C-alpha cells in the first residue's frame, strides 16, 4: 500500500510519474504540470470517490517521479516510457496499423506519386492519410484519370522501347519518352498537388482562365481538353463532403460505456472530409487522460500533422502538445476544444462515429460468442474455444520445411500469437514428423497453463490429429481440446458420371468418423478461415526462405558482391525485385556500394532486358 505521507515531499515541477505495484511492475505512467498536485489527486477524497481511480490506486505500492524542465519534455518522456515499459493501465496503440499516404518528391525530374506508410521530414510533399492501401490506390486511380502522371521509376520506363499501357489508357503522359514537355508535365504536377490539397477553387479558376485563353487564340483542341478536365474535376469534387471553409484538421471524438472507450479520428483535408479511423480500447481512467495519452502516442508516430487538432474536451497540456506538434511539423499546429460553430459540430460528428464503432464492436462480440458456443456444442468440446490455435506445415519435397502457428481470440486473428518454425530435426518430406516437432516445441517453449489455448486445430486428417494427441499426451497437456480439419475432396459419382466435391470434415479424438458441419455454417466458416490463415502464414514463410536463397545465388554471381554487401543491399531494398527496379544512382547510394559496382550490379540484373539501355 502506498504511503500517503510521501505526497507532500513530491516536487511541484513538471515531470513524469510512474505508479508501481508491490513487485515493482510499472502499472501506469503519466505526466503533469505539477507532479505534487497531479499525484495527490489520485489519493485524495476526490480521487477515491471515482470508481475509475479507486481500482488503480488500490494496486499502487510506490510512485516514482522524474522531474523535467518543461511540460513539452514531460510529454516526450511520458511517451518514451510508455513505449518502453507498456504499462498495463496505459493506452495501448501498439497494434494500430500505420496509415497510408501519397508522397510526391518535387525534386525529381518528372515527379510521381507513390503510396507510403511513413511521413518523413525529407522535403517531399505528402497527402492523406488513407486508412488502407486500397483506399490510397483508389485515390491514385481517380487522380491518374485527371492528371496523367508517370507510374513507374524513370529507369524502368526508359528501358522500354515504347510507352507503357497506362499511356494507351490516357492515364500517363509518357514523359520518359518525351511525349510531353517538362513545362506541361510540371503543370500536371501542380494541378495534382492542388487537387490533393483540396484547393479545387484555385485549380478550377486556373483551368478556366487557360481554357478561355486557348479558345481566344483559336487553340480549340487545347481548350476542349481543359473543358473536359474542368468537368471531370467538378464531378469528382461533388462526391466529396465539404465540412469547413478550408485547411487541414484532425478531429477527435470520444464515447465511453463503463471501461469500454471508443475514439474516432476524422481527417479533414482542404476543408473536405476524406476519411476516418476508430480505436476501441479498454480504459479505466479519466477521459481527459485518455485524450491526452492518445494524442501524444498517435502524433509521436510518423504521421501527417495537420494545421489544427480539435478535441472533445479541455486538455490540460494542450499548449505543450501544440508546441511539440509544431516543432515536429516545422509549422504551427494548434490544439483546440471548440465550444460552438462548425468546428464544434465536427467534434460532435466524431463523437457519433466513436459511438457507432463501439456499437459495431458489441454486435461483433455478441455474434462471435454465439458462434463459439455453437462450435463447442457441435464438437463436444470441454472448453469454450475463445482462444484457438492452428498449425500447418509447408515444404516442397522436404526442402525449406517450415511450420506455422496462428492464433484467434474470440473469432479474430491475434497477431501476437503468430509464430514461424524452421524445421530442425526432420530430414526429407515427412509432414507427420515435422508436425510432431512443431507441436512439441510449442509446448516446451511455453509450458505455463495460462498460455495454453482452448482448442488446437491442425490442417489435415486423422493422421495429423493422431500426431497432435500424441504430443499432448507425451507432454501431459490435459487442458486443451484437439481437432483436425480436412479439406474437401473431389469424388466421382459413378452412376451420374460426374465429379462432386465433399464437405470439409472435422476429426476428433476417440471418434472414428468425422463430424460434418453444415456447409456455410458459421462454425465451419470460422474453422476454415483459421485453417486457411495458417496455410497462408506457412507458405509465405516458405516462399520467403526460398526467395532469400534465390537472391543470394543471383547476387553471388556478380563480382565484388560478398556477404556484407549482399546483406546491405537486402537491408536497403528488401527484395531482389526492388533491387532490380532501382536506378544506378539508388544502388550507388547504398552504403559500401561504389558507383562502379552499382553500374555492374545494374547491368548484371538487366542483361536480358529488351530494348536499349539508357
Swiss-Prot record:
Residues 201-236 form the UVR domain. One of its GO terms (biological process) is SOS response. Residues 12-91 form the GIY-YIG domain. One of its GO terms (molecular function) is DNA binding. It is found in: Cytoplasm. SMART domains: GIYc. Keywords: Cytoplasm, DNA damage, DNA excision, DNA repair, Excision nuclease, SOS response. Pfam families: GIY-YIG, HHH_5, UVR, UvrC_RNaseH, UvrC_RNaseH_dom. InterPro entries: GIY-YIG_endonuc (IPR000305), GIY-YIG_endonuc_sf (IPR035901), GIY-YIG_UvrC_Cho (IPR047296), RuvA_2-like (IPR010994), UVR_dom (IPR001943), UVR_dom_sf (IPR036876), UvrABC_protein_C (IPR050066), UvrC (IPR004791). CDD domains: GIY-YIG_UvrC_Cho, H3TH_FEN1-XPG-like. GO terms for cellular component: cytoplasm; excinuclease repair complex. Disulfide bonds: none annotated. It comes from the Bacteria. The UvrABC repair system catalyzes the recognition and processing of DNA lesions. UvrC both incises the 5' and 3' sides of the lesion. The N-terminal half is responsible for the 3' incision and the C-terminal half is responsible for the 5' incision. HAMAP family: UvrC. Interacts with UvrB in an incision complex. Belongs to the UvrC family. This is UvrABC system protein C.
Amino acid at each position: 500500500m502506498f504511503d500517503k505521507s510521501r505526497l507532500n515531499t513530491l516536487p511541484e515541477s513538471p515531470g513524469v510519474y510512474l505508479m508501481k505495484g508491490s513487485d515493482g511492475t510499472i502499472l501506469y505512467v503519466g505526466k503533469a504540470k505539477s507532479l505534487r498536485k497531479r499525484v495527490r489527486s489520485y489519493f485524495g477524497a476526490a480521487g477515491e470517490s471515482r470508481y475509475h481511480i479507486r481500482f488503480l490506486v488500490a494496486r499502487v505500492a510506490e510512485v516514482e517521479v522524474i522531474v523535467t524542465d518543461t511540460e513539452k519534455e514531460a510529454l516526450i518522456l511520458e511517451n518514451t516510457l510508455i513505449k518502453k515499459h507498456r504499462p498495463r493501465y496505459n493506452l495501448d496503440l501498439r497494434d494500430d496499423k500505420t496509415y497510408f499516404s501519397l508522397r510526391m518528391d518535387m525534386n525529381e525530374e518528372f515527379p510521381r506519386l507513390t503510396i507510403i506508410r511513413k511521413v518523413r521530414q525529407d522535403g517531399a510533399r505528402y497527402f492523406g492519410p488513407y486508412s488502407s492501401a486500397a483506399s490510397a490506390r483508389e485515390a491514385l486511380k481517380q487522380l491518374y484519370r485527371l492528371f496523367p502522371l508517370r507510374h513507374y521509376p524513370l529507369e524502368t520506363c526508359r528501358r522500354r522501347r515504347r510507352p507503357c499501357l497506362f499511356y494507351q489508357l490516357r492515364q500517363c503522359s509518357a514523359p520518359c519518352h518525351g511525349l510531353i514537355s517538362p513545362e506541361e508535365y510540371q503543370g500536371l504536377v501542380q494541378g495534382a498537388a492542388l487537387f490533393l490539397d483540396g484547393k479545387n477553387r484555385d485549380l478550377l479558376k486556373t483551368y478556366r482562365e487557360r481554357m478561355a485563353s486557348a479558345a481566344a487564340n483559336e487553340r480549340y483542341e487545347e481548350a476542349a481538353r481543359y473543358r473536359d478536365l474542368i468537368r471531370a474535376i467538378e464531378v469528382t469534387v461533388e462526391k466529396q463532403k465539404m465540412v469547413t471553409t478550408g485547411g487541414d484538421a484532425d478531429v477527435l471524438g470520444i464515447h465511453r460505456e463503463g471501461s469500454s472507450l471508443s475514439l474516432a479520428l476524422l481527417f479533414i483535408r482542404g476543408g473536405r472530409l476524406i476519411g476516418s479511423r476508430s480505436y476501441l480500447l479498454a480504459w479505466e481512467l479519466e477521459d481527459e487522460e485518455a485524450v491526452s495519452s492518445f494524442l501524444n502516442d498517435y502524433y509521436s508516430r510518423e504521421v501527417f500533422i495537420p494545421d489544427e487538432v480539435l478535441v472533445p474536451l479541455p486538455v490540460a497540456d494542450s499548449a505543450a502538445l501544440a508546441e511539440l506538434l509544431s516543432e515536429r511539423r516545422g509549422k504551427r499546429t494548434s490544439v483546440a476544444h471548440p465550444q460552438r460553430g462548425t468546428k464544434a459540430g465536427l467534434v460532435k460528428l466524431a463523437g457519433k462515429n466513436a459511438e457507432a464503432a463501439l456499437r459495431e464492436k458489441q454486435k461483433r462480440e455478441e455474434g462471435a460468442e454465439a458462434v463459439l458456443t455453437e462450435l463447442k456444442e457441435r464438437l463436444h468440446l470441454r472448453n469454450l474455444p475463445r482462444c484457438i490455435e492452428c498449425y500447418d506445415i509447408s515444404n516442397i519435397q522436404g526442402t525449406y520445411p517450415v511450420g506455422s502457428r496462428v492464433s484467434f481470440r474470440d473469432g479474430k486473428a491475434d497477431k501476437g500469437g503468430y509464430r514461424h518454425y524452421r524445421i530442425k530435426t526432420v530430414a526429407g518430406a515427412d509432414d507427420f514428423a515435422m508436425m510432431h516437432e512443431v507441436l512439441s516445441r510449442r509446448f516446451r517453449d511455453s509450458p505455463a497453463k495460462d498460455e495454453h489455448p482452448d482448442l488446437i486445430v491442425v490442417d489435415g486428417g486423422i493422421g495429423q490429429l493422431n500426431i497432435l494427441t500424441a504430443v499432448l499426451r507425451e507432454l501431459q497437456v490435459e487442458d486443451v481440446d484437439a481437432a483436425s480439419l480436412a479439406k474437401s475432396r473431389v469424388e466421382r459419382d459413378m452412376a451420374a458420371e460426374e465429379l462432386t466435391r465433399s464437405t470439409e470434415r472435422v476429426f476428433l479424438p476417440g471418434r472414428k468418423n468425422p463430424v460434418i458441419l453444415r456447409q456455410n455454417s458459421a462454425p465451419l466458416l470460422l474453422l476454415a478461415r483459421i485453417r486457411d490463415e495458417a496455410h497462408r502464414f506457412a507458405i509465405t514463410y516458405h516462399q520467403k526462405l526460398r526467395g532469400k536463397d534465390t537472391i543470394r545465388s543471383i547476387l553471388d554471381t556478380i563480382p565484388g558482391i560478398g556477404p556484407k554487401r549482399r546483406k546491405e543491399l537486402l537491408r536497403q531494398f528488401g527484395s531482389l525485385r526492388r533491387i532490380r527496379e532501382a536506378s544506378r544512382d539508388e544502388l550507388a547510394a547504398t552504403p559500401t556500394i561504389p558507383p562502379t559496382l552499382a553500374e555492374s550490379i545494374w547491368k548484371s540484373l538487366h542483361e536480358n532486358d529488351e530494348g536499349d539501355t539508357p
